[in-house]
Each structure stands twice: as C-alpha cells, then as structure tokens.
C-alpha cells in the first residue's frame, strides 16, 4: 500500500499593508486595524477611487541589500524576496549546495510588471496619426532600461527567488489572478507528496497599486469609492459594501516532510492537509451566483484532507466586499457545511488588508496557520449591518478565541479559478489514509 507523505508548515514570512512581518501583520489583523488610506505612491486624485492598502515604510533589510537580483527586482519582487527570506529564517532552513536539488519553489504572481513610466516612454514614439514609430524606440540613446524587458516576464519573480536562494529542484509560476497564491501553495503540496522534493518555498506576491492597475479596476467598477473613510471602505458581508480596496504584498511558507521536520525538532505550525482546485467557467470577473465552483474546491479540499465539514472550525473567506462575490461565497459555504455553517467561525481579513490580488491566497493561508497556532479567529472588521444573504457565522466586533482543529482558506480568481486549502492542527490525528497511513 502507498503511504501518503504528510507535509508540515515550518516557516512563515509576510509583507502586507498591516505589517512588514508575520508577527506585526497577525497582531494588527487580530486587533482589526486597517491598512487602507489615501494612495501616496502616485497621484490618484483623478481616479474615482483614491484609496488603497499600501505597504508602508518598506525597505529592503540589510541581509538583502547586496543581492545581485535586486537590479532586476520590481517593488512586488522585493516584497517576495523579503517575505521568502523571513519564511526561511523562521523555519531555520536554507538551501545548500548539497540539498539545492531537493528544494522546490512554487510562486503565485500577477500581471506582467511594466512600470507606468515605461509605458509613457513607448507612447512617446506613437505618431500623430496613431501609427507606431519603432525607429526611436530602438535607437541606442533611447532612455528605456533594457532590464525592464526581463523584469516584465510573468515568471521573473520565480527566477529571482530561485537564483537568490539557490533552489535547483522543481519550480513553477502560477498565474490565475486572485487564486494565484492559493493555487501555488496547492501545487507545492502535490509536488511534496509525490516526492519530487523534500522542501518547498511557496507563496505569492503582487502590487497593482499603480495608475494602470487602479484604472483597470475602476473601469470594472470593482473598487470602493468611499474615499473619505478608507479604513471603513472594505467591509465584506456588510449590506452597504460597495467594492474592494486594492492592496499589495507578499506571503511565503516553508513546507517540509512531516517526519523530517519532527526529527530535526522543528516547530510545526500546522499540517498542510488538503488542496481543492476548480473552475467556475461562468464569467471572467465573477463566480456563478450558485457558488458551484467554490463548492467543488471546498469539497475537494475536505476530501483530500480526510476532513468532515464538522471538523473545520475556521474559514478564511475570499470575502472581497463586492456584492456578488460575498453572497455567492456564503451560498457555497452553506451548501458545503450545511448546519455547521451556523457554528464554524468565518471572516475575511481583506476587511483590514484590502485585496492583495495574486498574493491574497498565500497571505490568507498564513493567516489560517497562525489562527490554528494561537486559537484565534481574526475579526471581520467593519461588519455593522450584516447582509441577510450572507447567513454564516461571521466573526463580528472582535476576534474570537476558540480551538481550531482545522481551517480552510478560500481564494476565488478572475477567470473563474477557485482555490481552497485545508490546514490541520499539528496535535490532531488525521483520518486513515490521509495522515501518512495506507490508502
């Protein structure tokens, strides 16, 4: 009989709008502190939305300042490098020459990284008739940075991380919009179970807080326009919600073989127990109102982890604060959990951090792991007038203390991609066939 490998989470690194590390981020989420404010990184005064959840006071730490890869790194790439460095330090692990081929990296990332200034430079070579004139663009004296082309590749973050940390095993870059970080972690779990590697550095990063990203979401009507009260603008499941707050950041986890982690005396935050992955195939911008896609993802994650719905004590919902998403996700939760939806704790930490797009699933997975560790379900901030169609047991007012045996993290992306990840308390005994036993 085949014994399935158990996977331990032993390191966490976070760079978010509410903290530059995991401890600060977690403390602020539990306190319900908002990271939203008026956008400072560029002039957003001409947009319908002028607020965002920016990473504040960010600087590359001394340990990374001499890194060669910084030459190629965008702001979002730097978030990733810092969060990954934190996760490895937290785990007390680092790829070495002898083990580098047994390390893998799975990264969730967003759109091509093209600086707004670079777009302006290209636009300068459009003639008055709208026809593009390449001669000037290709001239040796053109001021554009040739490194920008390398930096703009969607897998550039993966390349920078693996180069900097010396990872030579399995590597993949996932691009499924808001589900990217979650699906990158799910991929890492599968790779670990198959024995391709012994360690994985997995997570996601993104920053769409620029004129291009803000204009796109404004045109879609997806963002809150509560510019006078940014700290209250993101209010998932509230009857008055009117859109999400755009954020930025990165989150990374270190995964390793459960038995090896215990043998070396590592602190194990949680077992990475299950992964669910589905497609809604409905619209590019939202899920079907029935919640069919998220239902499949949650059912898959529970089955993969060997968990019954009643064994789950906390769900970190995708909860974007948009009218359609919040209702359909609650319908999906009710369909999967049944009467247990009245008991398990549910919250969306986007109420504090905003929507980190490709990084969201990875950061929120880390939130689930910390919730399991501390026995705390973080508050769903700004929830004052509950939408009656969001009839699940939401964490209101303040964070809730409870023993969390298992937790789910939902991420639902543009294009219909859905991710659900299941995490189990390290003291919980898994179901036969799902905890390393025969199946």
Predicted regions: what they are:
Residues 9, 22, 27-173, 205-214, ...:
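Conserved beta-ketoacyl condensing-enzyme motif
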Residues 6-10, 33, 37-38, 228-305, ...:
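Condensing-enzyme catalytic core mediating Claisen C-C bond formation in acyl metabolism
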Residues 87-99, 261-265, 297-314, 336-340:
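Phosphate/pyrophosphate-binding loops at sites that engage ATP/ADP/AMP, CoA/4′-phosphopantetheine
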Residues 40, 196-242, 275-289, 319-326, ...:
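Acyl-CoA/ACP chain-elongation machinery
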Residues 126-145, 186, 190, 194, ...:
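Glycine-/small-residue-rich "gating" segment that lines the acyl/pantetheine channel
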Residues 1-69, 91, 109, 259-271, ...:
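ACP-dependent fatty acid/polyketide chain-elongation machinery
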Residues 14-23, 65-85, 111, 145-151, ...:
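Active-site pocket-shaping loop/turn-to-helix segments
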Residues 80-93, 154-158, 162-165, 171-206, ...:
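Active-site-proximal alpha-helical scaffold in enzymes
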């Amino acid at each position: 009989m085949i014994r399935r490998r158990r996977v331990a989470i032993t390191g966490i690194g976070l760079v978010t709008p509410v903290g530059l590390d995991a401890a600060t981020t977690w403390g602020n989420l539990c306190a319900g502190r908002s990271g939203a404010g008026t956008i400072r990184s560029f002039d957003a005064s001409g947009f319908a939305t002028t607020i965002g959840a920016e990473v504040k006071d960010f600087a590359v730490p001394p340990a990374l300042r001499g890194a060669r890869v910084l030459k190629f790194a965008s702001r979002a790439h730097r978030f990733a490098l810092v969060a990954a460095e934190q996760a490895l330090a937290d785990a007390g692990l680092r790829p070495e020459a002898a083990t580098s081929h047994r390390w893998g990296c799975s990264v969730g990332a967003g759109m091509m990284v093209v600086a707004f200034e670079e777009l302006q430079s290209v636009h300068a070579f459009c003639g008055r008739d709208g026809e593009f004139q390449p001669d000037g663009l290709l001239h040796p004296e053109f001021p554009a940075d040739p490194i920008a082309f390398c930096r703009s590749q969607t897998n550039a973050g993966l390349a920078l991380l693996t180069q900097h940390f010396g990872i030579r095993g399995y590597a993949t870059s996932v691009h499924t919009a808001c589900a990217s970080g979650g699906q990158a972690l799910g991929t890492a779990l599968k790779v670990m179970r198959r024995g391709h590697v012994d360690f994985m550095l997995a997570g996601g990063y993104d920053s769409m807080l620029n004129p291009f990203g803000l204009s796109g979401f404004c045109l879609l009507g997806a963002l809150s326009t509560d510019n006078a009260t940014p700290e209250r603008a993101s209010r998932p499941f509230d009857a008055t919600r009117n859109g999400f707050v755009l954020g930025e950041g990165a989150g990374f986890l270190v995964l390793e073989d459960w038995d090896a982690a215990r043998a070396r005396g590592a602190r194990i935050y949680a077992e990475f127990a299950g992964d669910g992955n589905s497609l809604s195939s409905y619209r590019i911008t939202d899920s079907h109102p029935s919640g069919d896609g998220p239902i499949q993802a949650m059912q898959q994650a529970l089955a993969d982890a060997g968990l019954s719905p009643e064994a789950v004590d906390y769900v970190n919902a995708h909860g974007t604060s948009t009218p359609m998403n919040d209702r359909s996700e609650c319908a999906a939760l009710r369909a999967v959990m049944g009467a247990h939806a009245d008991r398990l704790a549910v919250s969306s930490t986007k109420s504090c951090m905003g929507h980190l797009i490709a990084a969201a699933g990875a950061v929120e997975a880390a939130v689930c792991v910390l919730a399991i560790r501390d026995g705390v379900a973080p508050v769903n901030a700004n929830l004052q007038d509950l939408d009656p169609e969001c009839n699940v047991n939401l964490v209101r007012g303040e964070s809730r203390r409870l023993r969390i045996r298992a937790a789910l993290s939902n991420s639902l992306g543009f294009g219909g991609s859905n991710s659900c990840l299941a995490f189990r308390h390290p003291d919980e005994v898994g179901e036969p066939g799902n905890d390393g036993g025969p199946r």
